[in-house]
Amino acid sequence: MQVSEMKYGERAIQEGQLITFPNPRPGRQYTIEITLPEFTCKCPFSGYPDFATLYVSYIPHEKVVELKAIKLYINSYRDRYISHEEAVNQVLDDLVAACDPLYMKIKGDFAPRGNVHTVITVEHHRQTESLC
């Protein structure tokens, strides 16, 4: 069996990080909506692939997540054994850690498997400092 070198796309996914840039309109609340139709991971019980469309909606604070970085980050799930619930929650945790948004919602709409259709929705609301 021939051992092949890592392909450039695999290397980009492995080295990818969630990159942010300054919000160009920090004084205005606006919503960024991103659709990621090719999310894949593996079932931690069977090893079968799971497919989903992820919908990300957020109101940025001081930082915005760069789109190519999100794509590479999402592609890193392809070979991970992770449940639907944990996958969507982990994506939320990682994106919130990267950009600290005012608000973020992620919906994972997983393709039916075994006659079961799963949709997982998670939200984050930025904590504001108490006035007291």
Curated annotation (Swiss-Prot):
Q: What class of enzyme is it?
A: oxidoreductase
Pfam families per record: QueF
Molecular function terms, GO-annotated: preQ1 synthase activity
Q: Which keywords, in A-to-Z order, does the entry hold?
A: Cytoplasm, NADP, Oxidoreductase, Queuosine biosynthesis
Biological process GO annotation list?
A: queuosine biosynthetic process; tRNA modification
Major location category of this protein: cytoplasm
Q: Which reaction does it catalyse?
A: 7-aminomethyl-7-carbaguanine + 2 NADP(+) = 7-cyano-7-deazaguanine + 2 NADPH + 3 H(+)
Active-site residues per Swiss-Prot or TrEMBL entry: 43 (thioimide intermediate), 50 (proton donor)
User: What positions does the entry give for substrate binding?
Assistant: 65-67, 84-85
Q: Name one GO cellular component term.
A: cytoplasm
Q: Which EC number(s) does UniProt give? A: 1.7.1.13
InterPro entries for this protein: GTP-CH-I_C/QueF (IPR043133), NADPH_dep_7-cyano-7-deazaG_red (IPR050084), QueF (IPR029500), QueF_type1 (IPR016856)
Subcellular localization, as worded in the UniProt entry: Cytoplasm
The similarity annotation says: Belongs to the GTP cyclohydrolase I family. QueF type 1 subfamily.
Q: What does this protein do?
A: Catalyzes the NADPH-dependent reduction of 7-cyano-7-deazaguanine (preQ0) to 7-aminomethyl-7-deazaguanine (preQ1).
The record's NCBIfam families line, in alphabetical order, gives: QueF-II
Q: Could you tell me what this protein is called?
A: NADPH-dependent 7-cyano-7-deazaguanine reductase
Q: Which organism is it from?
A: Thermosynechococcus vestitus (strain NIES-2133 / IAM M-273 / BP-1)
